[in-house]
Amino acid sequence: MSSALTQQPAYRLAPSASSSTSDINAAPDADSKKKTGTKRRRPQDGTSDSADSSSQPPRTREGPKKKKANRACFHCQKAHLTCDDSRPCQRCVKRGMADNCTEGHRKKAKYLLDEEELAQPDPPYVPPDPMFPSSYTASAPFSLGSEGANLEYSILSAILGNSPDPTGPPNSGSPSVSHAPQPSAPFNGQPDIGAGSAISGGAQGAAAVYQAVTKPYDYTEGYHFLMKHLPTRFDKNDILRIVRALAIFRPSLIALQMPLSEEDEVFVEKCFQRSLIELDKLVSFSGTPTVAWRRTGEICLVGPEFCMLTGWEKEELVGRRKYIYELFENQSVVEYWENFANHAFENTTQSVYSHCVLLKPSGTPVPCTFCFSIRRDIMDLPSLVIGQWLPLL
């Protein structure tokens, strides 16, 4: 029994020894396989081990390499394509444009320009179009004080077929276009409100404004007329409502006008009269009855549609110290001053909508829907009010 027990561990250790030796012998083989697998590299001569890759010849570029031209032709330059030095180039020959193959225009850098070239501005290029009259040129006789504005008006005139020709009559075959009347009455030297609509548009009208306005406009006269006018038309309650509305914005106006010098007020009046010129153009293009007046209510601009709606003549309203509230019914006057007081110093981009009853010269009422917007001057004072009406049928 003792001999058997002593031999049993030897019998059990034999397999472990053999397995360990086999594992030790197998480990170098596995490591050698891993090392050989990681060290496998692609041949440097470009050939592969497979038969398919060895059978294919290497790819080569067909033909000589294209050389970039020093200067592309006009068509290749416009298409942003590579050109060659030959004229005509191969691309133009293939496309059948060999006769028009010319050198492209290369813009010169500013530091390479001569003094004469810098002094001469490039004329604006206008492509010819058979739809428009051939007599159109970029130098149309418009005197708007701006080359860009002259060009735009010239293009519009050419589209409408009314390109101005100072030497001859207009084209009889062109459609006639109605233009807004331009009264030729000059400024009378006073900053009168009616003179704003009597100025011709453009740079000439602006120059007349700057020369004519020599003193500030007296707004107190308009409020004095209002105080005299109220007792003749309104009862005590309506007068009280209007006076309360005036008391809302009048102190703010006085406070903003206190630091202004006489030169500032003259400048504000010039800006006001200048804005009337531009507003007159807009009113002439609009078909809505429109009137513009000062913050005191004094009318300064009247559209022809408003005269057709109410029966008033333009000469009766402009230039005669006529006030807009004289054309309103009593209740409309009260509502207007209350709305003006609430929106005088608010956002000027919004309009105020209300109901209004206009009065004809005979006293006949004309019920309308009414909206007005308030424009401020450079000193942030409400200066110009633009009103529009639509009749209620």
From Swiss-Prot:
Keywords, ordered alphabetically: Activator, DNA-binding, Gluconeogenesis, Metal-binding, Nucleus, Transcription, Transcription regulation, Zinc
Chain segments carrying region Disordered: 1-71, 161-198
The PAS domain, residue ranges: 275-348
Pfam families (UniProt xref): PAS_13 (PF24990), Zn_clus (PF00172)
GO MF entry, a single one: zinc ion binding
UniProt DNA-binding region: 73-101
Comp. bias regions, Polar residues: 45-58, 170-187
Cellular compartments annotated: Nucleus
InterPro entries linked to this entry: ERT1_acuK_gluconeogen_tf, PAS, PAS-like_dom_sf, PAS_13, Zn2-C6_fun-type_DNA-bd_sf, Zn2Cys6_DnaBD
Entry's Gene Ontology BP terms: cellular response to starvation; gluconeogenesis
A single cellular component GO annotation: nucleus
Family membership: Belongs to the ERT1/acuK family.
Function: Transcription factor which regulates nonfermentable carbon utilization. Activator of gluconeogenetic genes.
Protein name in the entry: Transcription activator of gluconeogenesis ERT1
Encoding gene per record: ERT1
